[in-house]
Structures are given as structure tokens and as C-alpha cells.
Regions:
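Alpha-helical transmembrane signal-anchor/signal-peptide segments
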Residues: 1-7
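Short, solvent-exposed loop/turn elements at beta->coil junctions and helix N-caps
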Residues: 10-14
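Extracytosolic and intramembrane catalytic regions of membrane-associated proteins
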Residues: 15-159
Length: 159
């Protein structure tokens, strides 16, 4: 009903229920995300876009670690540059929280080039591009479970 032309759509029930659903649509250059409760009074609305920015990853695209991240995310990821840090956001598990499409995605990794003097080898002893990939945000970090559960229950009731 949003008249959005999309490449792919992914819907799934949120945890522990089949009343509150999440939806993610892939556009040519971005993703949109929404929640929908069976108790909502209006149809789901995709309002906030998250640009893919896949071009930010191009200098590292042939790196084995980067390819593993892309596979892990099923190809559903966005890139951001925050405070001069290149961040890979895995969209596979959705967003943290239920605040009208504005919450961050659950999994993210900072990608940085290591010191050029450091040489990394893969399992075949071939030289690799030296990259450091560090998980910086996950569903386990800085959680306020009681608050999140209350937000979940409120959103479940519908808007």
C-alpha cells in the first residue's frame, strides 16, 4: 500500500510471538524497515530509509573477511562512516528496539586497515589485505532488558 518499488522483501515475527511482525524492503540503493502489530489500526508504513552505501566497502571487497561478513549477512547490509570509522551493519537480525524505524541495527562491525607493516596470511599462506574487523555493537551490549520488554509490549498492543 506504500507504492514503493522494491527488489526484495523480508518479513518475520518478532521474538516470542506471532502478533508483532517486522518488515524490511530492499530498494536499489537503500533499505526500509517497519514494525506491524496485528492490533495496529492502520497498515504498515515504511518511512525511514537506510542508504546501502556499499561503495564504501569497495576498497576492501576482495578481502576474505569482508566476503565472510557479506555471506553472514545474506547480502543484507549497510555501510556508514561514523566519527571516521567505517561500520558494516548486518541487517539480518533487524533493529534494536521498536521506536518507529529509527533504532540502530543489532549487529555492526568496525572495519579498519591495520598497520602496513603487519602482514596477515590466510590458511593457504597467501598474503591478505591487512584488515581489522571488530564487533562494536551487538544485541548483548548495553541492554536495558526491562525497558526493552516494556517497549516491546507497548508496540505489540498496536498503534
Amino acid at each position: 500500500d506504500n507504492n514503493i518499488e522494491y527488489k526484495d522483501i523480508n518479513t518475520r515475527a518478532t521474538y516470542f510471538n506471532s502478533i508483532l511482525w517486522s518488515g524490511q524492503i530492499e530498494l536499489e540503493d537503500s533499505y526500509m524497515f517497519t514494525y506491524y502489530s496485528l492490533f495496529d489500526k492502520s497498515p504498515p508504513s515504511f518511512t525511514k530509509k537506510f542508504p546501502k552505501n556499499h561503495d564504501m566497502l569497495m576498497p576492501f571487497i576482495d578481502n576474505k573477511k569482508i566476503q565472510q561478513l557479506i555471506i553472514l549477512s545474506n547480502g543484507h547490509y549497510i555501510m556508514t562512516n561514523e566519527n571516521n570509522e567505517l561500520i558494516f551493519w548486518n541487517l539480518k537480525l533487524g533493529q534494536k528496539g521498536f521506536d518507529k524505524n529509527a533504532s540502530p541495527y543489532i549487529w555492526s562491525y568496525v572495519i579498519e586497515k591495520t598497520d602496513q607493516s603487519e602482514i596477515l596470511l590466510d590458511e593457504t599462506n597467501e598474503k591478505m589485505n591487512a584488515l581489522k574487523i571488530q564487533e562494536v555493537r551487538s544485541f548483548r551490549n548495553n541492554r536495558k532488558y526491562s525497558e526493552e520488554f516494556n517497549n516491546f509490549m507497548e508496540r505489540l498492543k498496536g498503534i
